[in-house]
Design a protein with these regions (language model features):
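Short beta-strand segments
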Residues: 1-18, 23-26, 32-37, 43-48
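Alpha-helix boundary recognition
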Residues: 27-28, 66
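Charged, gly/pro-rich active-site loop segments
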Residues: 41-110
Length: 110
């Protein structure tokens, strides 16, 4: 399922409704994969998602989101009672380009 997200502090951050299937699945099994929306030049990251609920970190996530997406959301957007905020710590990443499909695949381990 597509999500808005931000790369910061060596992790991928995003939020989802607390009751969504995405949140429920990650709370049951924290292993996950994240990919870019560009199918011609994809980057795929696999890692572990951790629920974030401390106010200081949520305030930083909100600032990153507002800056990236030019929004003006308030902390209500990340209220832990209604929404889940996750930090995905990457284990590895894989990328390739459509121009050099067979020669460009690259893998990084973190």
């Amino acid at each position: 399922m597509p999500v808005w997200g931000m790369w910061a502090e060596d992790a991928f951050w995003f939020s989802s409704s607390r009751g969504s299937r995405k949140s429920r699945n990650l709370l049951a099994n924290s292993k996950c994969a994240v990919s870019t929306e560009d199918a011609n030049n994809p980057v795929v990251v696999e890692g572990v998602a951790a629920l974030v609920d401390d106010l200081a970190t949520l305030e930083k996530v909100l600032a990153w989101e507002n800056a990236k997406y030019e929004t003006d959301y308030t902390m209500e957007m990340l209220d832990p009672q209604a929404n889940s905020c996750f930090r995905v710590t990457p284990a590895w990443a894989f990328a390739l380009t459509s121009d050099d499909f067979t020669g460009s695949p690259t893998r990084w381990e973190f």
